[in-house]
């Protein structure tokens, strides 16, 4: 932390997901506008942004708009898919939609979520409980009304001159960057640095040390440290 204390490093995540009051609409353009205002107000040429999954897509969209305020963008598993499933069918959302109205307390959510992920509770009950609590707090509209369209990542990549690092997971374990998408991104911007991880979609959780080595490489490469 001391080494990078002179930098401004921001983890980009989705407003409304436990981090703000409920929103009228959940979409990347809405999220982007909220965070753009922050960077326009607090100008600093040494900003770095990092995002995971939808947060990575948001960070990449944001980079195109506020590039002059950034040194680099680090993307963990952006969903660079040509087609994206309906949000109501994605991940645990069918279970949440069916059961959330029954959760009167956080304990209800934890006990019910055990039915969906018994292995997760056996392996790491603390982490699994936190996941259940996140779903308990989240606005139900995040699971039912999220307006999402595939990202035009090629155009964004082509437009950027800042450093771009991408952490890519194993497709067979739940990764969301197909080989074709990786190739298209590199065709658009040959300076993008990809690193492959033999993990599922949550690289930071599954391969923490290797993940942070890659983040350090990104920060060192993007600065004069």
Locations of the language-model features?
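Catalytic histidine-centered segment of alpha/beta-hydrolase-like enzymes
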Residues: 199-212
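Flexible "cap/lid" loop of the alpha/beta hydrolase fold
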Residues: 64, 73-102
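Short amphipathic alpha-helix adjacent to the substrate-entry channel of hydrolases
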Residues: 1-9
